[in-house]
């Protein structure tokens, strides 16, 4: 009975450690962030999810357009989270953003209908809202730009923030800020 117990316990521990491992070899982990990922089950899970989404996205993107260099750049950016006040939170947010970005760019999600906003002097904005994602995410297209922004908490309306971009919609009217440019927009009817 005790031999069987120890055998089962050994197998359980072996499988548990495999399930908690990230997609990369932890014996080769370098730097604070990679070591943290190896020791944090939640971050290891995000790493495995990203690896899976990355493979799926690559299968849908033509070879000439595949974001391999961009992925290496993303890894470097993720590893820069050691500079953050909350290393774990920074790392988790980097993973979540990259997973969503790859799901959208790789065509892994059903694309909802777009909503068009007229913005006066600012270019017309076409917005696609991915409400099936957590956090809700939107792709904003104008001129030759395409920006991905995530829903953030606001007192009223729907507010999305991305890199150097903010979109705040309330009752069909929106405020947009892109770098130092601000505009007021209305849904096109």
PLM features per residue range, with description:
Residues 20-189:
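N-terminal alpha-helical modules
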Residues 14-17:
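N-terminal signal peptide c-region/cleavage motif recognized by signal peptidases
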Residues 2-9:
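Sec-dependent signal peptide recognition
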């Amino acid at each position: 009975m005790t031999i069987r117990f120890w055998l089962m316990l050994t197998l359980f521990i072996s499988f548990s450690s495999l399930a908690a491992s990230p997609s990369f070899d932890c014996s080769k982990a370098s730097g604070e962030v990679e070591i943290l990922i190896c020791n944090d089950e939640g971050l290891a899970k995000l790493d495995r999810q990203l690896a899976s989404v990355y493979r799926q996205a690559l299968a849908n993107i033509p070879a000439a357009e595949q974001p391999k260099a961009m992925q290496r750049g993303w890894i470097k950016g993720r590893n820069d989270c050691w500079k953050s006040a909350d290393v774990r939170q920074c790392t988790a947010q980097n993973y979540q953003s990259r997973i969503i970005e790859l799901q959208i760019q790789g065509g892994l999600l059903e694309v909802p209908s777009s909503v068009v906003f007229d913005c006066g002097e600012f270019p017309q904005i076409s917005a696609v809202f991915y409400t099936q994602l957590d956090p809700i995410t939107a792709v904003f297209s104008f001129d030759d730009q395409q920006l991905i922004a995530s829903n953030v908490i606001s007192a009223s309306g729907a507010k999305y923030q991305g890199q150097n971009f903010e979109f705040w919609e309330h009752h069909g009217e929106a405020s947009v800020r892109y770098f130092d440019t601000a505009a007021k927009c209305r849904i096109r009817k």
